Amino acid sequence: MRTGTTARSIAVTGAALLAITACGGSDDEGSTDAGADSGEKQVNVYGTDGNMGNALGEDFSEEGALAGMKGTTPLTDLSDDFKNRLLEIDPDLQDYNYAGETYDAVILTALAAQAAGSTEANVFKEYVNGLTFGGDTCTDFASCKEILDAGGNVDYDGASGPLSFADPGEPAEASFGLLQFGDDNTLDDELTSFVIAGDEDNAATDEGPAPAPAGATGDPLVIGTLLPLTGNLAFLGPPEVAGAALAVQDINAAGGVLGQPVQLIEGDSGDASTDTATQTVDRLLQSGVDAIVGAASSGVSLTVIDAITQAGVMQISPANTSDQFTTYNDNNLYFRTAPPDTLQARALADLIIEDGNNTVGILALNDPYGTGLAENTVQNLMDAGLSEDAIQSITYDPQAANFDSEVQEMVDFNPDAIVVIGFEESSRIIEGLNQNGIGPQR
């Protein structure tokens, strides 16, 4: 599906960003994309990983309702082979958001246990960061396992790209997809490009303990999943579930971990408005899992991280991006293969600036993900040269009956660009923007 793509690296800072801003239109003219033929201002609308998926388009029946809407999501240029193998797991996949990150979360967990010679999370947690840099490069479990069994050090470059974990157990740099909706309200894969944000030099330097001697254990590695099968992030569930299942399939095809097949116990995270995640975590812990992959939602993870890590179980999320996890007191048992919002905010702000927008409105979900990404985006826009009064950031309650007041504030502000940072409720917000002539609808 990701065909006709291009790749580039984010290195636009300081004066370069100021130069791009200076090339944009005036406040009256809007951005360079805006209504050039009619002379009318076309507001540019942007999304992020919480809504930039084909599931968003399913809420719109009118052609062109999302046409031209752009956005960012952690994404690498996945190989056709990897995507085809995911489709063998789930032939109905619509997109691949966080499939690579989920696959890598499972592989890293298995490699850490293999390296430690133990399925005890408090033992193998010390190996996780060191598996992502500094050693011999490998790209799948089988080849990495061969290196470990020979006493070597591993640098796992996975499906989501080189991970290069920093000390908090998160990527120091990451690939982001720049996505755009077409007239049919689906993502136009021909317009997808990729950028790199962050710096691999910020990766940790401690490669951790030496691998334990190769051997077997009587206890199989048991991995639970806490992924969104229901709730406002359910559209992310299928690719994440497929990524986890494919990883376990590959691990067991290579002989499993410490001579035993890995066991996978699946579970639903729901969303932050329910206690589904708490119930699932209780069930997984009672089942004796050694690690839990999930949740996707930062808000959901914050409700269960203490229960998981205080039980001596590792949590590794493929999609948490809130900055709160970088400094969270997690007994060194929390990791993530998704990059923190500081990196996505940089990619998003660069995209907005490169499109020539001089004024920016932000509508952000009032939760750790939404407020964190909004704050970081505002800072990056200001670092790029926009003044504080050229940016208006509003938070909203996703459970609200309507978003009329928030939309009206955007109408009154009349910015060149509007960023919607949300989940499934984003469609209702965008519908309101369209009805008021400031949405993506062409």
Positions of predicted regions on the chain:
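Extracytosolic ligand-binding ectodomains
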Residues: 2-9, 14, 24-442
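C-terminal motif of bacterial Sec signal peptides marking the signal peptidase cleavage site
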Residues: 19-22
